[in-house]
Amino acid sequence: MTSIKQEDLIQSIADALQYISYYHPVDYIKSLNAAYEREESPAAKEAMAQILINSRMCAEGHRPICQDTGIVTVFLEIGMNVRWDDATMGVEDMANEGVRRAYNYPDNKLRASVLADPAGKRINTRDNTPGVVNVKVVPGDTVEVIVAAKGGGSEAKSKFAMLNPSDSIVDWVLKTVPTMGAGWCPPGMLGIGIGGTAEKAMLLAKESLMEPIDINELKARGASNRAEELRLELFDKVNALGIGAQGLGGLTTVLDIKVKDFPTHAANLPVAMIPNCAATRHAHFTLDGSGPVMLDPPSLEDWPQITYDASKGTRVDLDTITPEDVASWTPGQTLLLNGKLLTGRDAAHKRMVEMLDKGEPLPVDLKGRFIYYVGPVDPVRDEVVGPAGPTTATRMDKFTRQVLEQTGLLGMVGKAERGPAAIEAIRDNKSAYLMAVGGSAYLVSKAIKAAKVVGFADLGMEAIYEFTVQDMPVTVAVDSTGESVHQTGPREWQARIGKIPVVVA
C-alpha cells in the first residue's frame, strides 16, 4: 500500500503545467528541426524558423510558447493500492487546484481562457479551471499522470464521423484535412481514434497525441498491425496534400500521425481526428509516495541555433500608411510593422458590431488603422506585454465586411487563412490581411514596445489594446486584389510534391 499526499499531486500538476508552458517536448523540436532543414518552400521554412526561434526563447526565458496557454487535460491512472491519507478533496478537485496554482503563478502567469456558462454569458473563470480530468483505477501502487494544455485553435479543428463499416478511413481523412485550414497551426500531429462509441473514439484520438513522435522508427521497422499501416499511409498522403507549415504550402504538414483503436459495434465505424498544433504541450510523470515530482529541464543544446534576419522584410509605418501603400503589397511578401497597432478578437468584434448596429460610437477610431487578432498573456517582470501571438482569423470573418465598410479599417493581422466571404470583403474594400506565425507568441511580443488598453477593458485578454510595435514580422496573406497565399501555396506545393521525391530523414 502506497500513501500519497494530496499536496504532492496538486503541486506536481501545477509544476508540470508551468514546465510545459515554456518547454516543447524535445522529440517535437528535433522532428521540427529535421523538417525545417529539408523544407523547400521559402514561406513554410520561414514559418518553421520562427517557431523554432520562439521555442528556444521560451525555454530560456520561462515564458509561454503560445499566448493561448490552453485548456488543461489531465489523465490519471490511480493504482488500486494507493491510499490518500490526508485527502480533503476528490482527485478531480486536486487536479483543478493544480491548474489554478499553475495559471496564477506570479512569475509566469498563464492566460485564463476557460469560460463558464458556454452557451450563455460565457464568463471567464479567471484561473483556467476547470480542466478536463480523466481517471482510471488500475492495478498497482503508483499514480501515473499525464498533463496537457491544448489551445483553442487546434481543438476547434477536431473532427468526428460515424462511417459505414465499408467506408475508407484514409479517404475520410484526406477529404477532411483540407477543410481544417491552417488554424490548427501545422506542422504538428494528427491523432486518430477508431472504434468504440462516439465519445470513446474522441478520447482515443486525444490520448494518442500524448505519445512520442516515432514515425521514422516505424518506417524503419515496418508496420505490425493495421493501425500502424494506417499511420504510415496517412503520414505520406497527408503531407502530399502540400498544405505545409501554417498552411503556406510546403513539404511538411504533419510530423507524425497517431492511431489508437478499440473494438466497436458491427454496425458502426466511429472515427475521430484531433490535431495537435505547433505549440504541442504535454508531460508525463509518476507519483510513488516519495513526494512531489521534479521534472528535469531539457538541455538548450537540443534546440538548433537559428537567427531571424529582419533585413529580409519591407518596413511599414502604420502611423502614416495609405491605401496606395496597401495596394502595392504582393501575396507572400514579408513586412515589418512599425508604429501603432490596435488589437481585437472575438468578443471585441461582437461588441463593436452591436454598437455599429445601434449607431453608437466605438471606443477607438478604426479609420486607416490595422487591427491585430490577439489576446495576449499578462506581462510579468519588466515586460510591456506577455506572449502575444495571433489567433485564428476565420472566427472574425463574419464581422469583416461590416467593420471594413463602416469604420474605414484599412487592414487586419491574424493567424491562418480567411474564408471566401472575408476575402471578397477585403477585395471589395481594397484592404489587406496579414498573417503572423502561430506558435511564435514570445518572439512577437519582443516586437511590442508599449501596450495600453483603449477599449472594452472588462473583456480582459479580449480587450482592445493599442500596441506600439517595432519590426513585427508578418506576411501578406490576402492582398488588396483578393489573392490568398493559403489558396495558391498549397495548390502549388501539392503539384510539386507529386513530381519530386520526398525523403524523410
Where are the regions a protein language model picked out?
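Generic structural signal for buried aliphatic residues
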Residues: L335-L337, L341
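Short, structured beta-strand/loop micro-motifs enriched in basic residues and often containing a Trp
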Residues: S311-I321
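Residue "hotspots" at secondary-structure boundaries inside conserved domains
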Residues: E324-A327, V364
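Non-transmembrane, aqueous-exposed alpha-helical and coiled segments at domain scale
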Residues: M1-I192, T197-D309, E405
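C-terminal binding/interaction regions
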Residues: G249-I257, T264-H265, A278, K446-A505
